[in-house]
Amino acid sequence: MGNACVGPNISGNGFLQTVTAAMWRPRIGAEQASSSSHGNGQVSKEAASEPATDQVQNKPPEPITMPSSKTNPETKLKPDLEIQPEEKKEKVLAEETKQKVVPEESKQEVPPEESKREVVVQPESAKPETKSESKPETTKPETTSETKPETKAEPQKPKHMRRVSSAGLRTESVLQRKTENFKEFYSLGRKLGQGQFGTTFLCLEKGTGNEYACKSISKRKLLTDEDVEDVRREIQIMHHLAGHPNVISIKGAYEDVVAVHLVMELCSGGELFDRIIQRGHYTERKAAELARTIVGVLEACHSLGVMHRDLKPENFLFVSREEDSLLKTIDFGLSMFFKPDEVFTDVVGSPYYVAPEVLRKRYGPESDVWSAGVIVYILLSGVPPFWAETEQGIFEQVLHGDLDFSSDPWPSISESAKDLVRKMLVRDPKRRLTAHQVLCHPWVQIDGVAPDKPLDSAVLSRMKQFSAMNKFKKMALRVIAESLSEEEIAGLKQMFKMIDADNSGQITFEELKAGLKRVGANLKESEILDLMQAADVDNSGTIDYKEFIAATLHLNKIEREDHLFAAFSYFDKDESGFITPDELQQACEEFGVEDARIEEMMRDVDQDKDGRIDYNEFVAMMQKGSIMGGPVKMGLENSISISLKH
């Protein structure tokens, strides 16, 4: 699942001849447009004046290694971005005597999620900076001496770029915790795909017979601290986004002496990219539906403080091969946690989809909206908006090229669709639409209906649901939160730090008010005070770290049997199999809960009225909801984490 960048010898090796009429149609200069049967494309004024024109590759390349953050802003992109021809690569690799080469990624038929982690080779780790804006880099597209005729052929995905390892064998723990024995619970089946860091297999859960995908990441290939941190962060982000219907779900992470095993949902419907290839382009109605899904994931990510940084059709998989199959976002290997107004400088992504501010090394989550805009353009027309024969040429077009709305099929596409694409591909990120604004655009709305009000941020939504729970359930969630691994709550920890402005370990009313405002929540002070009091279980007047985690925890954590049993066991002090009023009173005292109204809590949960709570009654309370003032539905459509309200 992955297609790599093609180097300067692209014309000589015949790759450009393997284009398809349905996809990536080459555009020509203005002087040739009249004689073309397709009438394809406009080029920038600079490109039109040059004697030779750029040709487009037959499909977008895989993410590439881009310039380091220390590159002189005045230096052109080409020296950092140009990929050596194969024979030159081998010569370079031979000279690196102490380095290993990770095998190239191969094409796979139905990859549930590739281990195709793109690596930014640079002296510094990929950390955001808040320095003054650097000067834009200048690039010149390369030109060919002649335009070769196109021939119809099945497009082949180029092989992944080779990754040259540094040195050394890493033996310490990657997950930083002891895990259960993977082989006791799962057996591996056929190979689904090969990535840079590991291999993806079909995976069978022994206890249930359920099928999953398992990405086994070889520890010996994690040769730098950055490699290890990338793996940890990817797992953390997948846990953080868990529960969204269009994000691939993670079942668990395991580690043994040789590998990290990441067990995930199995998606067997193939890539969005492949369906675009088959169709040429989508109808507007279907394209709008897919755009809603893609941008909906973005809105969810951004509200949870996550920037994807590598959106492209290859990173979306269908659950099945059915026409109306659910679409899932995969591969968070380049994703990062971010804070409001944080500036990132490391250049990562894929050439056709990278935002101009990323190339200028000063960007934030707005760059994801640009990438989504490129995908929408491709869904509607079958070709990318900015293209050239070389990577350098692509970047020049991204920075300065003009959008083409004159070539087929754009004359037959609605003005509303064109308006959305224009607003998503504004080069100034401050003027670009946000993910939520895209969802409110008339072309994307469901049956022409926009949300009545801005979507609640994930933090606000979860706190609202938490505030509606009775104190017994709040305490149980606190127990579950304290039992979770660091990787499962790392995202919430980042959000707590963002709101806790003075780093006191306590969130005050003013800090909560400011934090909710930063993520787009517009609440009255009385409403914020209600949320504050609901989360402040021990009535201390502030929200401490553990209270915040419990109040913002996604309720999918309740579905796990081990979490439920651990919480029940905490209250069942004498291990009798029942929770008595005295045991519940003791727990309230431990949590500092005053005015607990023990009898009322018992009455709400004790279904058989025997004066005690058994395990089944406890599970029913946790899963169905037992809330002061009425029942609450806890399906995906009402999950207040990151589901979208229509």
UniProtKB/Swiss-Prot annotation:
Swiss-Prot/TrEMBL domain comment: There are 3 contiguous domains conserved in the CDPK subfamily: a kinase domain, an autoinhibitory (junction) domain and a calmodulin-like domain. The autoinhibitory domain (450-480) inactivates kinase activity under calcium-free conditions.
Subcellular location: Endoplasmic reticulum membrane
Composition bias type Polar residues, residue spans: 32-43
Residue ranges constituting the EF-hand domain according to the UniProt record: 487-522, 523-558, 559-592, 593-628
Name listed for the protein in its UniProt record: Calcium-dependent protein kinase 2
Family: Belongs to the protein kinase superfamily. Ser/Thr protein kinase family. CDPK subfamily.
GO molecular function terms listed in the Swiss-Prot or TrEMBL record: ATP binding; calcium ion binding; protein serine kinase activity; protein serine/threonine kinase activity
Record-level GO cellular component terms: endoplasmic reticulum membrane
Subunit (UniProt): Interacts with 14-3-3 proteins.
Signal peptide annotation: none
